[in-house]
Regions:
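Register position in tetratricopeptide repeats
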Residues: 311, 347, 381-382, 411-415
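Terminal, low-structured helical/coil segments at or just beyond the last alpha-helical repeat
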Residues: 386-415
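Alpha-helical adaptor scaffolds
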Residues: 307-316, 320-377
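Ser/Thr-rich, Proline-interspersed low-complexity disordered segments
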Residues: 36-100, 394, 415
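Cysteine-nucleophile protease catalytic domains, especially the papain-like/related folds used
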Residues: 91-179, 185-186, 251-274, 297, ...
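Noncatalytic regulatory segments and standalone regulatory/sensor domains
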Residues: 200-203, 207-208, 217-312, 317, ...
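N-terminal Sec-pathway targeting helices
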Residues: 1-15
Length: 415
């Protein structure tokens, strides 16, 4: 009699497991529970391997010199450090003062899925121009896996240009509050990347800091606030000017502009010479330099200085700036979102620093394709080609759209 009972119990248990699995992957249930599963995995990792602060600069870094020209990956832009051409904008018909208040018609709001603030904010931005998609169509195009925690501005640009080509897309850095108001007054919403703070820890000793995309659709001079369509906190959020600038600084004050083709002359006129990306970067570099001088303890000012120097391929100067930022203390998740330090330390030959940073980044975000890529390049510089190839292949597994990883694999195959 006991054998049928055991068989029945095993059958019921197996059936229950199957049903639970089917229920878990039912989209409404999966969207709710996957957040908790993501949290549980991160917290478990943090208990087993405690998360500390990002590594500070090495006291006497060894510089690896490689005389083979072919040993340098060609995955970074190569602009001139001094702009050779300054764009002359077409002036607006009449430079009238900014209105006291602007409230653009907000697009239909949607709550972001897990790790999806970029696609959600972009979906709302495109919806302002009557696009009929949602965050999931954007995420499906840009992210091989739902667990991908970062979508950068270049990836967002790729989506707009390939899926909403009737709109124009530009981004610049080093923005300021007045510039945001000018675009809003011209009828153009602005999307920015900014700091975000979790409500609770994802691991013991979590500093709670992360990144977030915010869509601005208005401002109010009387109340000194911007209106944000926030995919996490809700629609029509009133955000103080001071908070916007403080949170924005961590991302080099990057701003994204999406607009109709006939609005391009207006955009050029507002940007003036900063329509030229090199000129814009030079201005951002000088602004970051000034901030480091006015407050030498400003971590983000030093980090931004390093990023702008990296853009101009001034790698040794960039690593000096990054060293300052690291010694002052970076947020734990900083290298989940920004990768210019990897580029600067690689090209300056400071491979020990590169490996220390990429290994820390992978401890925080094990599926970061960018950290895997640059950890692989560090391995390559140390002559560990098999380890490098394993990193490159894993980066491509994490994001099958990642062309830099495919380039790296092909590069090793050719050398």
């Amino acid at each position: 009699m006991r054998k049928p009972s055991l068989f029945n119990a095993a059958f019921v248990f197996a059936a229950a497991v199957v049903v639970m699995g089917l229920v878990y992957f039912f989209p409404p249930v999966h969207q709710r529970l996957s957040w908790r599963l993501d949290f549980a995995k991160a917290y478990f990792r943090g208990v087993v391997d405690p998360v500390e602060a990002p590594p500070t600069s090495l006291p006497n870094p060894e510089v690896v010199v490689n005389n083979h020209a072919s040993s340098t990956p060609t995955t970074t832009p190569h602009p001139s450090a001094t702009p050779t051409e300054v764009f002359t904008p077409t002036p607006l018909p009449s430079p009238t003062p900014l209105p006291q208040k602007i409230a653009l018609e907000p697009p239909r709001w949607e709550y972001q899925d897990i790790n999806n603030c970029g696609p959600a904010a972009l979906a709302m931005y495109l919806r302002f121009y009557d696009w009929d998609g949602d965050q999931h169509s954007i995420a499906d195009a840009l992210k091989s896996q739902r667990e991908d925690r970062n979508v950068n501005v270049e990836e967002l640009a790729y989506f707009v240009r390939t899926n909403a080509g009737w709109l124009n897309y530009e981004y610049r850095v080093g923005g300021d509050l007045d510039l945001l108001k000018q675009f809003l007054a011209a009828g153009i919403p602005v999307m920015i990347e900014e700091s975000f703070y979790f409500e609770g820890p994802y691991w013991p000793n979590d500093d709670l800091w992360a990144a977030h995309y915010q869509l601005l659709t208005g401002y109010d001079e009387t109340n000194q606030t911007f209106t944000g369509q926030d995919s996490y906190h809700g629609a029509d959020q009133e955000i103080p000017y001071e908070t916007v600038d403080e949170y924005w600084q961590a991302f080099n004050r990057v701003y994204i502009l999406i607009y109709l083709p006939h609005q391009e002359e207006t955009v050029k006129a507002i940007l003036g010479p900063q329509w030229n990306p090199d000129y814009n970067r030079q201005q951002a570099l000088e602004a970051a330099q000034a901030e480091t001088e006015s407050d030498p303890e400003d971590t983000f000012a030093w980090f931004n200085l390093g990023s702008n120097l990296t853009y101009f391929e001034r790698y040794l100067e960039a690593t000096d700036a990054y060293d300052q930022a690291r010694d002052l203390g970076l947020p734990q998740r900083m290298l989940r979102y920004q990768f210019s330090p990897f580029i600067a330390y690689f090209h300056s030959g400071q491979i020990d620093d590169l490996l220390a940073l990429t290994e820390y980044a992978l401890k925080i975000t094990p599926n970061s394709e960018e950290a895997l890529l640059w950890h692989g390049w560090g391995m390559y510089r140390q002559g560990k080609n098999n380890d490098a190839l394993a990193n490159f292949r894993q980066a491509l597994i994490e994001n099958s759209n990642y062309l830099d990883a495919q380039y790296a694999i092909d590069f090793l195959g050719a050398n």
